[in-house]
Amino acid sequence: ANIEGVYNLYEAARKTGCTRILFASSNHAVGFYKQTDYLDDKALPRPDGLYGVSKVFGEAIASLYHDKFGIETAIVRIGSCFPEPKNHRMLATWMSYDDFTALIDCIFNISQLGCPIIYGISDNDGKWWDNSGTAYLGWQPKDNGRNFQESLDKRMERPKPDAPDAVYQGGYFTVDPIYASEDD
């Protein structure tokens, strides 16, 4: 779906004259960066698995259709969009529903969008991503994952310092197998 479906989406947009798309990419397009790396919209892809690779493909299609046909796309590398962070890694990657809704409003109400990469996160302490390159959108996330840290600390232990969830931006996706079975 992330390969053929994205191509079909952009072809349909081209054929019907649609001029703007919000592409739901993912933090897993850059998941093999370490949590000590601070990324901006110029960071090269480092997918952490085949899912991340499929999102990089979608970002490339968005760029191609912008350059070739003028279809504007907000490439939103969504961190974690849930009512609240589900684990300690998500304290940095979390995006509230309110902040996502505000981002959508900005994307579809600005006169000229282009084809920017936007990190879909709230205004979290300890975030790994920099959206200053897309300040022209006027999006100002207001929520912060830190408000959930105390309840997370009570519910679960923090990951060990060498665990993928504590080392890589993509967390455990970096160790998921990309083959069908152990015999492959």
Predicted regions and their residues:
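Conserved catalytic Lys-bearing alpha helix of Rossmann-like short-chain dehydrogenase/reductases
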Residues: 3-9, 18, 54-62, 100
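Conserved Rossmann-fold NAD(P)-dependent oxidoreductase catalytic core, especially the SDR/UDP-sugar
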Residues: 4-46
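Alpha-helical substrate-binding/gating segment
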Residues: 16, 77-84, 94-116, 123
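Flexible, glycine-rich beta-alpha linker
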Residues: 29, 46, 50, 68-91
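Catalytic helix-loop patch of NAD(P)-dependent Rossmann-fold dehydrogenases
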Residues: 34-70
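Core catalytic loop region at the nicotinamide-binding pocket of NAD(P)H-dependent oxidoreductases
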Residues: 72-73, 107-132, 136-137, 141
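Conserved C-terminal active-site "lid" loop/helix of NAD(P)H-dependent oxidoreductases
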Residues: 123-140, 155-182
